[in-house]
From Swiss-Prot:
Keyword flag Transit peptide: no
Protein name: Energy-coupling factor transporter ATP-binding protein EcfA1
Annotated source species: Halalkalibacterium halodurans (strain ATCC BAA-125 / DSM 18197 / FERM 7344 / JCM 9153 / C-125)
Gene Ontology terms: cellular component: ATP-binding cassette (ABC) transporter complex
Primary gene name: ecfA1
Domain ABC transporter span(s) in chain numbering: 5-239
One Pfam family linked to the record: ABC_tran
Compartments in which it is found: Cell membrane
Membrane-topology descriptor: Peripheral membrane protein
Amino acid sequence: MEKGLLLESVSYQYDANAAPVLKEIDIHVPLGEWVAVIGPNGSGKSTLAKLLNGLLLPTSGRVTFNGMSTMDEGTHWEIRQQVGLVFQNPEHQFVATTVRDDLAFGMENRGFPREKMIQRIEEVSIQVGIDHLLDEEPHRLSGGQKQRVAIAGILAVEPSVIVFDEATSMLDPQGRKDVLETMKQLHENGMTIISITHDVNEASQAGRVLLLEKGEVMLDGSPAVVFHEQDKLEAAGIDRPFAYQLQLALQSRGIQLEGALLKKEELVEALWKYKSSN
C-alpha cells in the first residue's frame, strides 16, 4: 500500500459530452512532502484539488489516501478529515458568528469531546497566530486573517494533508506573506502540503513542482529542475521565479552565480558571496 495521496490513471470530465479536464494523470504525494501545482487557467488545477479529498470523484481511474479510495462510501469521511482543503475565498468556509465557534464547528461534526475541542482551539489558534481574534466575527477580518482562520479550522480536526487551492491569490502582499509563512511552519512540523497556485515565487518554496497543462502533467520535479525547462514553461504561459530571471540576466552580463537561485534570499546571499570573492 502506497502511503500518502495516490492518483492512478485519473481522468475527469464535468459531463459526458465535455472534453476531459484531466487526462489519465498519475501522481504520488508521499506524507511529509510539499508539492506545488502550477499551470495556466483551465489546466485542471482546481479540479485536481477537489479530487484529492473526494469533493469530486474521478470519471475514471482511482484516487486513494493511505490505501482508502475516495469512491468507497465507507472511507469517504475519513479521507475528508485527513485531507483538508483551503479555498481561494475563505468566506465560503465560515459557518459561525465568531472565530472560536467557527473553529469548533468541524470538531463538533466529528464528535470531538468538549475538553478536546477547547484544547484544540487554543493550540491551533496559537499555531497560526489568531489567538487574539477568537471572539471576532470572521467576516470582519482582513484577507490574510480570514485565510489563517480557515487554515486553523482545518488544523483543528487533525488532518495529515492540507490542500491550498489558490489560497493566496486574492490577498494583498502582507496577507500572502503571512499565509506562505504559515505553510512553511506547517511543513516544518511534518504536515503534507499541496499548494495549487499561479504564483511561481510561491511554488519555488515547495520541495516539488508539478506543471499541469491541458489536463496533463507536463513536468514533475524539484523547483530547480522544473524552472529550468524554459520551452515547456513558455508553451504553458508560465514565467520563471523573479530571482531566477534576475540570475539569468546577470549571467548574460558575465556574473556567474552557482546553482539555480529561485528565492530572493538565495540570490542575495549568492550576490554577497560573489562580491566578497571578486
